[in-house]
Amino acid sequence: MIKKIFGALIFLSLSTALAFAVDDVPLPEVILTGLQAYSMKGPEAALNAWTKGGPLENDPKVLGSVRVFQEVEKYYGRYNGYNLIRQKKLAPNSKLIYLQMNYEKGPLFIRFLCYFSGDQWVVSGRLVLNTEPDEVLN
């Protein structure tokens, strides 16, 4: 009986660890290009890179997100890099990507809906970003 309980606990522990593991799949080029543009040229360049080739390209509502990044920089300071939280595969050609963008005084959480369109990944849904993780990581 004890062996069965112990075995079940090990199985549950391993299952839980695998469920929350960040996969080793590289980030899509569109995400990396936007992050590099952000660090070198600022939020407008990042948003242009993230939306290039997707349905949100040249959408004025998306470019309105520049103000959000400017507010974050105003209160949180300079951008210092990012951490991948996780990639969640929805289907063979779509996935959600969750990142933590790091600033001097705190993080910004961001979620991208990416779609494999022909031969490349594009950002195909609105960007969800907030300094509160619960607003993004659902």
Kindly give the residue locations of the regions a language model identified.
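Residue-level recognition of short, well-ordered coil/turn positions
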Residues: 42-43, 120
